[in-house]
A protein has these predicted regions:
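Long, charge-rich alpha-helical interaction segments
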Residues: 113-174
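Acidic, low-complexity/disordered tracts enriched in E/D and polar residues
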Residues: 155-234, 256, 267-269
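Short amphipathic alpha-helical interaction segments
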Residues: 246-260
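Short capping segments at the starts of secondary-structure elements
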Residues: 232-244
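Active-site region of the double-stranded beta-helix
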Residues: 1-75, 83-125, 130
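Residue-level recognition of conserved beta-strand edge/terminus positions
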Residues: 78-80, 267
Length: 269
C-alpha cells in the first residue's frame, strides 16, 4: 500500500537485553516493527542539536523523553522526521526499521542541474573580432552579457525531462548498494529456460514506471505501448512468471539484460 518510490530501506537489528544504539533521530519517516522479543522506547518531539561527534547515526549528547512505551512482537512504532528516540531491549529481540525517502529539495536542485548538464549542449564559443579599445576595462561588455543571456535562455526543459529526471533520481542505487553477481547466461539458454523460470526484482533495486517510461538503477527507458501493461504488473509485484513472457518480446530482452546487470534474480519454478 506504500509507493515503492517512497521506500528507502529496511534494516534488521538484533539486541541482547539492555542493548541500544543511544538516543538519536532520523531526517525521514520511520516505522519500527518489533519482531521477536520486546523493547522499551522513549521518544521526544524536541531535541538538542548537540550531537556526539564521529558517529554514523545522529546520536544526541542529551535526551529528555516526552513519552515512552513497551513494544512486543507485531507492534509498530511510527516516528516522524527529526523525532528523537531511544530504544532499549528488554530481552533478546529483533527490530525491523522501515525507512522512507524524503528528498532534500536543495539536493534535488543540484541533481537536476547535473541532469541538465548531461542533456543539453551549448555549442560554440563567444567571439568579438571587432572589439574596440575601451576606457572602462573593468566593465562587463554589453555584447558579452547579451551573448551569455541568449545562450543560457536556450536551456529549456519539458514535462518529460522532469519526469525522466525524477525517475532516475528515485531509482539511483544507494552508496552502500551491492548488486547480485551477474548471471552469465547465453541468450539461447535463457530462452530455453524462460517458461520454467520466474524472475524477481533484486531486493535493493527500485523499478518504477510512469507514463511510457520505466526506471531502474538510475536509468530511464521507454516502454513500447504493447508492453506497458505487463511491465507495470512486473513493477507493482516485483515478480513475474516466465510462462507469461513471450520469448520474442521487449520484456524478455529486457529481463535478459537485467540478469547480466544484477537487477533481477531467476527462480526455478
Amino acid at each position: 500500500f506504500i509507493p515503492f518510490a517512497r521506500l528507502d530501506d529496511i534494516m534488521v537489528s538484533y539486541a541482547a537485553p539492555g542493548g541500544n544504539v543511544g538516543p538519536h533521530y532520523d531526517s525521514y519517516d520511520v516505522f519500527l516493527l518489533q519482531g521477536s522479543g520486546s523493547r522499551k522506547w522513549q521518544v521526544s518531539g524536541s531535541h538538542s542539536l548537540d550531537l556526539i561527534p564521529n558517529q554514523e547515526l545522529r546520536i544526541l549528547k542529551s535526551f529528555v523523553p516526552e513519552g515512552q512505551c513497551e513494544v512486543t512482537a507485531g507492534d509498530i512504532l511510527y516516528l516522524p522526521p527529526n523525532f528523537s528516540h531511544y530504544g532499549v531491549a528488554l530481552e533478546p529481540c529483533f527490530t525491523y526499521s522501515i525507512g522512507f525517502i524524503a528528498p532534500i529539495f536543495d539536493h534535488v536542485k543540484s541533481e537536476f542541474l547535473h541532469y541538465l548538464d548531461a542533456e543539453f549542449e551549448l555549442p560554440g564559443i563567444f567571439q568579438d573580432p571587432t572589439r574596440k579599445a575601451t576606457d572602462q576595462p573593468g566593465l562587463i561588455p554589453d555584447d558579452l552579457l547579451q551573448a551569455v543571456t541568449e545562450q543560457v535562455s536556450r536551456i529549456k526543459w519539458t514535462k518529460n525531462n522532469i519526469l525522466k529526471f525524477t525517475g532516475e533520481f528515485l531509482t539511483q542505487s544507494a552508496a552502500n548498494y551491492q548488486s547480485l553477481p551477474p548471471n552469465i547466461l547465453s541468450k539461447k539458454k535463457f530462452l530455453s529456460q524462460l517458461s520454467s523460470t520466474s524472475y524477481q526484482i533484486e531486493s535493493t533495486v527500485k523499478f518504477l514506471y510512469r507514463e511510457q517510461f520505466g526506471f531502474i538503477g538510475g536509468n530511464a527507458f521507454k516502454i513500447p505501448t504493447s508492453s506497458q501493461s505487463i511491465f507495470r504488473q512486473f513493477a507493482n509485484t516485483r515478480l513475474i512468471h516466465g510462462h507469461a513472457i513471450q520469448p520474442d518480446s521487449f520484456l524478455a530482452e529486457t529481463i535478459f539484460e537485467w540478469l547480466s546487470q544484477g537487477y533481477v534474480r531467476s527462480i526455478k519454478t
